[in-house]
Amino acid sequence: MPGRGLLLDPFPGSGPHGGAERPVRRGRIVDPESCGRLLGRIADAALGPDRSDSVIVLSHPVLAGAEHRTAARALLAALGTTRVLVLSSARAAAAYAGPRETGPLLVVDMGAELTEVTLLVGGLVADARQAESGLDDLDGLDPATFPTVLGRTVLDMITSMWRHDRHGAIRGALRKGPVLAGGGALRSDVTDHLARCLGTRVRLADDPSTTVVRGAGQILSSVLRHRPTPPERSGHPR
């Protein structure tokens, strides 16, 4: 949240009766009611009861379908906000951890339930791959083989994109160095393995696990700075 740091739901795993509440799985909203409660708690803490003249950024998996985006928009609209900005998690990660220079960029997001590789060209998604597996699926794996298994998933997706790339964008993005995000990028054995296999440097934010949310916040701050100043209201200020 601009000016207030990161604001997270303090009880994301607690339902109204003390049970587990996992409204989003594999990047999809599977329990809209629980998701609405979670968003409501965050909005209460961040915005208070009056959500007028407020802006929310919605970041979604890069290959999220129209049905998922529509469901998410509906939940956010129910909060009473004025405007919702929708962008992919890859664009958010690039905004925070990507280089300032233009050109093609690879974003590798290794999350708990999804692993994604995205090629951005001019800030727009040019190609993407998604594996419906993540860190949670590798629990219990031999630590010595963990980087190899996760790395193989990432490298297979990059190889697939390379084969379909007719303009050399993947090669240019690799020379620049991919942005690594998500919990998998917290592990130096994983990041070192990817750097060796790709033969290039990798780009990491201070806390890769929050790269996407920090990038979304950065974009939100930019939007708020450039939006028109509302006219002054008569009466007592609120």
Predicted regions and their residues:
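Internal active-site segments that recognize and position negatively charged phosphoryl groups
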Residues: 106, 114-115
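Amphipathic beta-strand/beta-sheet edge segments enriched in Tyr/Trp
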Residues: 117-120
